[in-house]
């Protein structure tokens, strides 16, 4: 293993702000489907996939308030939600499949189109389907 040794007479100190992660935000947003209370999410990176997931959740019936300048989302889904996620909302994002599990858990049924997204290698959804089958989904 290589090392990086820093020698100096000045002590390093300070703080930096770490931006939020898209790959953490998308599953957290999908998981909000399981909760029927108000949720505040902070340090949200407002990138295209996050906006696509917001639009998908809004279509399903989730109330989402976006506070872009503060990187905050306020999520509320205390009403009956749709159990369908159409292709036109999933075609540009792989993470759309993540709403399938929470919708199945909450409503015992869901119809989610296969996701689109970029073609970086193979990223099949069969593992999601296999896991849901093992949990009793048909």
What are the functions of these language-model segments?
Residues 1-138:
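Structural preference for solvent-exposed beta-strand-turn elements
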């Amino acid at each position: 293993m290589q090392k990086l040794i820093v020698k100096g007479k000045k002590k390093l100190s300070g703080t930096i702000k770490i931006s939020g992660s898209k790959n953490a935000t998308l599953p957290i947003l999908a998981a909000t489907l399981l909760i029927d209370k108000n949720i505040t999410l902070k340090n949200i990176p407002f990138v295209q996939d996050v906006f696509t997931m917001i639009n998908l959740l809004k279509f399903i019936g989730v109330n989402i308030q976006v506070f872009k300048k503060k990187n905050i989302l306020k999520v509320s889904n205390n009403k009956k939600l749709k159990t369908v996620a159409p292709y036109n909302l999933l075609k540009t994002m792989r993470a759309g499949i993540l709403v399938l599990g929470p919708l199945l858990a909450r409503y015992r049924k869901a119809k989610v189109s296969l996701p689109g997204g970029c073609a970086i290698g193979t990223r099949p959804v069969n593992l999601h389907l296999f896991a849901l089958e093992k949990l009793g989904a048909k």
